[in-house]
Amino acid sequence: MGLREKLAELREEGLQDIKQSEDLKRINEIRVKMLGKKGPITSVLRGMRDLSAEERPKVGQFANKVRDELSAAIEEKRAELEQAAMNAKLAAQTIDVTLPGTPVAQGQPHVIQQIIDQVVDLFVSMGYEVAVGDEVEQEVYNFEKLNLPKDHPARDMQDTFYVTPSVLMRTQTSPMQARMLEKHDFSQGPLKMISPGKVYRRDTDDATHSHQFHQIEGMVVGKNITMADLKGTLEAVAQNLFGDKLKVRLRPSYFPFTEPSVEADITCFNCLGKGCAICKQTGWIEVLGAGMVHPNVLKMSGVDPEEYGGFAFGLGPDRFAMLKYGVDDIRNFYQNDVRFLNQFDQKG
């Protein structure tokens, strides 16, 4: 019997064995037996050295064809057996599709983020631009351009986290005032912006202080903008967060970046001005600082204070959340106690 006939016989034998295989173990045995280095096809091929130069390539091509056919048949049978095994496994498992599924807990925005979103949505509805700045800021934007000179106490190492002598973790979101003033085209109208974000100060953490907290800076600069515009804006914020009946009063204060500067108080939302423990019987609650943008701040950002003016304010979402929900310790917001945080579930 010639080599070609032997190969044909091995092919038929192999295909028959593959067809009759009933499990994966048997199909693997056939693969090793027929196609392995010690298998019959390899043994037949060793006899090719005795063939003539004319016959050798023909037999070689036929041998490769036989090997390919057997390999394809083995893989096809393997896939068939694997699918059959999977079907048998699934058939053996009883699944009651009427049983309720396992509930998956849904996340939600943190209570402070809820306050931020509420304030941002309000200002966006009033045409403000949201400007989000970097938490690592250049000292010049955090201080000089906001009219805080070199000898100002807020610039001491004991109050500020410095990264390098000229780079720091921003102590306020106010640097975005200067950055937005520098690039705004006033020929297109006034600048109306808010800048929410995290800020950092070297405070000792206690019930009312944290080394990291949140701030929302707001500013409007244009022509003919007055303190009355500021008061109306702050009343819109207070009423949006605490109720329509609240009023705002302004008291003189001092901030380096505004002149004149004011502290803004709102009617106590608990007693509506009658006096209670929350407002210490005054009927008012201090909520934020504000004022008219200092001419020096405008000048240092290339804006002519003789032509343009405006107001600025900075509110603390952390403090607003404490007031709104009666939380007496700011640390509760950051300790990740789910029992505490779930009280502010927006889904109810």
From Swiss-Prot:
Cellular component terms per the entry's GO annotation: cytoplasm
Pfam families: Phe_tRNA-synt_N (PF02912), tRNA-synt_2d (PF01409)
Localization (cell): Cytoplasm
Main location as per UniProt: cytoplasm
E.C. numbers: 6.1.1.20
Cofactor: Mg(2+)
Keywords, ordered alphabetically: Aminoacyl-tRNA synthetase, ATP-binding, Cytoplasm, Ligase, Magnesium, Metal-binding, Nucleotide-binding, Protein biosynthesis
Binding note for cofactor: Binds 2 magnesium ions per tetramer.
Membrane-spanning ranges: none
Gene3D superfamilies: Bira Bifunctional Protein, Domain 2 (3.30.930.10)
Catalytic activity line of the entry: tRNA(Phe) + L-phenylalanine + ATP = L-phenylalanyl-tRNA(Phe) + AMP + diphosphate + H(+)
The keyword Nucleotide-binding is annotated on this UniProt entry: yes
Binding residue positions for Mg(2+): E259
One of the protein's GO biological processes: phenylalanyl-tRNA aminoacylation
Superkingdom assignment: Bacteria
Gene Ontology molecular function: ATP binding; catalytic activity, acting on a protein; magnesium ion binding; phenylalanine-tRNA ligase activity; transferase activity; tRNA binding
EC class: ligase
SUPFAM superfamilies attached to this UniProt entry: Class II aaRS and biotin synthetases, tRNA-binding arm
Subunit structure: Tetramer of two alpha and two beta subunits.
Similarity-based family: Belongs to the class-II aminoacyl-tRNA synthetase family. Phe-tRNA synthetase alpha subunit type 1 subfamily.
Name this protein carries in UniProt: Phenylalanine--tRNA ligase alpha subunit
Encoding gene (name): pheS
